[in-house]
Amino acid sequence: SLIDTGASRTWVFGSDCTSKSCGAHNTFGKEDSKTIKVTDEKWDVAYGTGKVAGVIVNDTMSFAGFELDTPFGSATTASDDFMSYPMDGILGIGPQDSKAKVPTVIQLLMQQKLLKSNIIGINLQRNSDGATDGQITFGDVDKSKFSGELAYSNVVSGGYQWEIAVDDIIVDGKPLNFQGRSGIVDTGTSFLLLPPDDADLIHSKIPKSAKSSVFYTVPCSTTTNIELSISGVKYAIKPKDYVGYESTTKGICNSLIIGRQAIGPKQWLLGDVFLKNVYSVYDFDKNRVGLAARKYGETKDPPSSSHPPPAPTSNKASGGSPGLPEQSGTSSATTSTTGEPSSGSTASPSAASSVSMSAWLSLAVFLSTASSLILWD
């Protein structure tokens, strides 16, 4: 499953799915489990690219040495967008919307007091670094994956997205003086999505960049340094992450910074283009996001391809949780450099874990990042 911080829903492709895209994936149903219980409750969700629908089922989810009885979605239809996505479902780890009726996996873990702390730590890898898997740690942070201390930013008003205030973007050492911007931290989005005027300004500072519709091209050899400032801390966005596939013109690549207003006029989607440069922590107790510079091995050249990424679309959820807020949230983001997560349950874990990182239960599983995805609901 794809780990998605931009959504709280968890679902898999069901064995009863009739859509062509389901044939490209592993499915799950009654023939795979004797304990699955299918309900009459319908669900559907439209992401930035793609839509799925189906029914809610209940079954036991097993991972990291213990079992969790949980409801989740079983997709009976899925749009063709999912044909090429290398995943068989989505594990939603975004904050739960207060209006949602179905508890999330994270809520159940918290209710049963299975975690050392009610936090999640995520480390994404790059293909160009020779590894396609990242790591997610439930209940703790992996200090071997980042340098320095974690800096925490409070989630802005609204609360059901990991949305934090953004100070500014700096290009080759020069601030662009953005004001009142916020960013949704979203592992389910491949790109960095900004309203057109914001994306125009950034690319105007990259030599020999050009625009076509919502897309931009830049020289494949560009060395322009981009930094994102959050809570007073600057985080690099390296060229190997924002310089994407080679276009039809030799030496010219597509930029993965996209000029598309996916949400509000001052809201950005901070996808994998940004997240591959940081270690990110999601604190459910204190409603905040922690960031630190990620440790990684350097490589010289980004991967190239003759195919540009598909155009993103902006669709809101239908019949499920409400879509993202239209108005940009504003709040003062606070920074903590203690490097310590918030304290969670003090109850002993109910099951041992083969990947325990301490005397308490800390769950670690591996994740892959799919290309050209925009997943928020």
Swiss-Prot record:
<dbReference type="GO" id="GO:0006508">
    <property type="term" value="P:proteolysis"/>
</dbReference>
<keyword id="KW-0472">Membrane</keyword>
<comment type="function">
    <text>Secreted aspartic-type endopeptidase which is secreted and contributes to virulence.</text>
</comment>
<keyword id="KW-0645">Protease</keyword>
<keyword id="KW-0064">Aspartyl protease</keyword>
<comment type="similarity">
    <text>Belongs to the peptidase A1 family.</text>
</comment>
<dbReference type="InterPro" id="IPR021109">
    <property type="entry name" value="Peptidase_aspartic_dom_sf"/>
</dbReference>
<feature type="compositionally biased region" description="Low complexity">
    <location>
        <begin position="328"/>
        <end position="351"/>
    </location>
</feature>
<keyword id="KW-0449">Lipoprotein</keyword>
<keyword id="KW-0336">GPI-anchor</keyword>
<feature type="region of interest" description="Disordered">
    <location>
        <begin position="296"/>
        <end position="351"/>
    </location>
</feature>
<keyword id="KW-0325">Glycoprotein</keyword>
<feature type="active site">
    <location>
        <position position="186"/>
    </location>
</feature>
<keyword id="KW-0843">Virulence</keyword>
<dbReference type="GO" id="GO:0005886">
    <property type="term" value="C:plasma membrane"/>
</dbReference>
<dbReference type="InterPro" id="IPR001969">
    <property type="entry name" value="Aspartic_peptidase_AS"/>
</dbReference>
<dbReference type="InterPro" id="IPR034164">
    <property type="entry name" value="Pepsin-like_dom"/>
</dbReference>
<dbReference type="InterPro" id="IPR001461">
    <property type="entry name" value="Aspartic_peptidase_A1"/>
</dbReference>
<keyword id="KW-1003">Cell membrane</keyword>
<feature type="lipid moiety-binding region" description="GPI-anchor amidated serine">
    <location>
        <position position="350"/>
    </location>
</feature>
<feature type="domain" description="Peptidase A1">
    <location>
        <begin position="1"/>
        <end position="292"/>
    </location>
</feature>
<dbReference type="GO" id="GO:0004190">
    <property type="term" value="F:aspartic-type endopeptidase activity"/>
</dbReference>
<dbReference type="Pfam" id="PF00026">
    <property type="entry name" value="Asp"/>
</dbReference>
<feature type="glycosylation site" description="N-linked (GlcNAc...) asparagine">
    <location>
        <position position="58"/>
    </location>
</feature>
<keyword id="KW-0378">Hydrolase</keyword>
<dbReference type="GO" id="GO:0098552">
    <property type="term" value="C:side of membrane"/>
</dbReference>
<feature type="active site">
    <location>
        <position position="4"/>
    </location>
</feature>
<protein>
    <recommendedName>
        <fullName>Probable aspartic-type endopeptidase CTSD</fullName>
        <ecNumber>3.4.23.-</ecNumber>
    </recommendedName>
</protein>
<dbReference type="InterPro" id="IPR033121">
    <property type="entry name" value="PEPTIDASE_A1"/>
</dbReference>
<feature type="propeptide" description="Removed in mature form">
    <location>
        <begin position="351"/>
        <end position="377"/>
    </location>
</feature>
